[in-house]
């Protein structure tokens, strides 16, 4: 298993790096050049930089990921593609994307886009909380322990 992180706006990178390093599982952070950092990463953690274009990180992750790899993303489109490839996919708020829930998530995203296109406003996501982070940590640890 390898871990790929859609890292541009991922609030749980620290959890992923800490837990994966302890378990000696390689992590690849995929992020745009606009988030460039020369900060040192622990052994087993690689950062791949991609252009800032829409979905560039998603395409790179899909190019690299193999069946049964673990992907962390908040992007439903990437999650859908990764599930079809046989990957395990987690959201940073601590839930696992499945073939059973992805269609509903994509449908909700589409309907919200149509509402916004018509000029109306939709609710944004709820703020990320410490409880969300701990929920993610528990799920992540249970997945990498398998």
From Swiss-Prot:
Q: Which InterPro entries match?
A: UPF0178
* Domain of life assignment: Bacteria
Which HAMAP family does this chain map to? Answer: UPF0178
Hey, which family's this protein in?
Answer: Belongs to the UPF0178 family.
- Write the protein's name: UPF0178 protein BCE33L2782
Question: From which source organism is this entry?
Answer: Bacillus cereus (strain ZK / E33L)
């Amino acid at each position: 298993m390898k871990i790929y992180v859609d890292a541009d706006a991922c609030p749980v990178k620290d959890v992923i790096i800490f837990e994966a390093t302890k378990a000696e599982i390689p992590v690849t952070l995929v992020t745009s050049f606009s988030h460039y950092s020369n900060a040192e990463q622990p052994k087993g953690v690689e950062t791949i930089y991609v252009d800032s274009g829409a979905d560039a990180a998603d395409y790179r992750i899909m190019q690299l990921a193999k069946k049964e790899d673990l992907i962390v993303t908040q992007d439903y489109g990437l999650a859908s593609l990764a599930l079809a490839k046989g990957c395990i996919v987690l959201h940073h708020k601590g839930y696992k994307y499945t073939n059973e829930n992805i269609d509903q998530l994509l449908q909700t995203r589409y309907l919200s886009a149509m509402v916004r296109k018509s000029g109306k406003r939709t609710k944004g996501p709820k703020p990320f909380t410490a409880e969300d982070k701990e929920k993610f940590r528990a799920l992540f640890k249970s997945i990498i322990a398998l």
